[in-house]
Amino acid sequence: MLKMESTQQMASSIINSSFEAAVVAATSTLELMGIQYDYNEVYTRVKSKFDLVMDDSGVKNNLIGKAITIDQALNGKFSSAIRNRNWMTDSRTVAKLDEDVNKLRIMLSSKGIDQKMRVLNACFSVKRIPGKSSSIVKCTRLMKDKLERGEVEVDDSFVEEKMEVDTIDWKSRYEQLEKRFESLKHRVNEKYNHWVLKARKVNENMNSLQNVISQQQAHINELQMYNNKLERDLQSKIGSVVSSIEWYLRSMELSDDVKSDIEQQLNSIDQLNPVNAIDDFESILRNLISDYDRLFIMFKGLLQQCNYTYTYE
């Protein structure tokens, strides 16, 4: 008959998967914290601690034992299952209790409270005597059951053994924290000094830019003043030209209507805006040239009617 160990193999696979998950969780946590690490070293440390906690807490043996019981029942050996049926009244309740017990065992093992300390604390309790420095050691029900089952031995050759408890070297921990603090302080100072230099350079560039802007503004002001002077000079020149033309017009032997028309055109010149004044001068010149052209045509027609000829010299 083929022997089935599928449940036991599944339990072992779950334990191994839990270890791999612990390694992945540890390495990913170190990566998120930005801590450099050696994967082999992390793997070895996690494996050592994981094996210690699983073995010392009894979780591994508990899971494997239950898996073996199930495999035996599947193989037709119901003795273990029948023996455990008396206390397995409710599988869900028992599973929840086992889960809670396993969590407590793992938590105690991770805190350095090994199996020896847990058994001793479960077997004995201490009762203080009021008013005295001594105390009474009391045996618990578990100790009584162990005595009845013959699980208690007396070691006549007592050898004091040092209990293996994880201790914390606070001095080295403080030195590590101090080194980390100094390293962080050094990085912060470097960043601050770099920021100060950068801010100083930006300030210098800003001052230089302000100086350039001030120089450009001064140059713009000079050009504006020069432009205003040119505009005033042009306005003055335009006014003097208009006055000179008006004076010259009055000295001419022209009819009053012609003088009045020319004066109106001169008075329409915009003396405040040189650009408009030039346009007005252009219009007046065009009108004068047009009048001269019409006058020449009239004179030419008159000569032809009188049978005269004309020449340009």
From Swiss-Prot:
It comes from Rotavirus A (strain RVA/Monkey/United States/RRV/1975/G3P5B[3]) (RV-A). Its main location: host cell. Residues 150-206 are annotated as: Dimerization. It is found in: Host cytoplasm. One of its GO terms (cellular component) is host cell cytoplasm. This is Non-structural protein 3. Residues 1-149 are annotated as: RNA-binding. InterPro entries: NSP3_N_rotavirus, NSP3_sf, Rotavirus_NSP3. Belongs to the rotavirus NSP3 family. Homodimer. Interacts (via the coiled-coil region) with host ZC3H7B (via LD motif). Interacts with host EIF4G1. GO terms for molecular function: RNA binding. Keywords: Coiled coil, Host cytoplasm, Host-virus interaction, RNA-binding, Translation regulation. Residues 170-234 are annotated as: Interaction with host ZC3H7B. GO terms for biological process: regulation of translation. Residues 208-313 are annotated as: Interaction with host EIF4G1. Residues 166-237 form a coiled coil. The keyword Cell wall biogenesis/degradation does not apply. Plays an important role in stimulating the translation of viral mRNAs. These mRNAs are capped but not polyadenylated, instead terminating in a conserved sequence 'GACC' at the 3' that is recognized by NSP3, which competes with host PABPC1 for EIF4G1 binding. The interaction between NSP3 and host EIF4G1 stabilizes the EIF4E-EIF4G1 interaction, thereby facilitating the initiation of capped mRNA translation.
